[in-house]
Amino acid sequence: DQLGIHSRTIDITPAVDGYLQYEPDADGRRRGNVMARMRMIVLFDLSAKLNALPVGTGNKTERLFGYFTWHADDSPPINPLGDLFKTQVWQLARYLGVPEVIVSKPASADLIVGQTDEDDLGISYHLADQILYFLLRGYRVEQIEEMGYPREKILLVKARLESTHWKRHLPTTAMLSTTSINDYYLRPVDY
């Protein structure tokens, strides 16, 4: 409302609970993933109704950390913030005049009461973005540590970056023919 943008709130609780009643032992991570996927079902359905496309809000930091639910918040076909670190998204929001109450709200998927991204990740976005910046440019752990960054945080970021690499790719397809549709697929116009 503060931005003058039409919005609609849809309670996904009945749909989520309808499934989770059959999985009473689901932990918080699984429950959060179910909620994120249900939210994406609603967004894609409404986009079909409106003849529109869902717009993603994920950022580079979340993608590099693998901090998203596969086939949920990583699904929108348009993601204008996807190549911006989280701290850059905040800078852009302030530049565009987004109300401070929105910009300064602790980052959260808003699926579990009291949950915050930084608590889940074990590092602040400010520190994570700086470390990611150097890792992506080929700096070694020792070089980043010499700049004054805590070794345990560098190793945490590096481990997340490496262990979630698979989440940033399309599913692997077994190549059984010369026309297999996977990472190497060439459309006829590409030949």
Residue ranges and their predicted role:
Residues 11, 58-59, 103-104, 145, ...:
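Short loop/turn and capping residues at structural boundaries
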Residues 18, 42-45, 88-92, 130, ...:
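Alpha-helical scaffold segments in soluble metabolic enzymes
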Residues 17-18, 64-65, 110-111, 152, ...:
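Short secondary-structure boundary/hinge segments and terminal tails
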Residues 31-39, 52-127, 133:
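Catalytic subdomain that performs nucleotidyl-dependent activation
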Residues 116-191:
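Peripheral terminal appendages
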Residues 1-64, 144:
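ATP-dependent adenylation/nucleotidyltransferase module used to activate substrates
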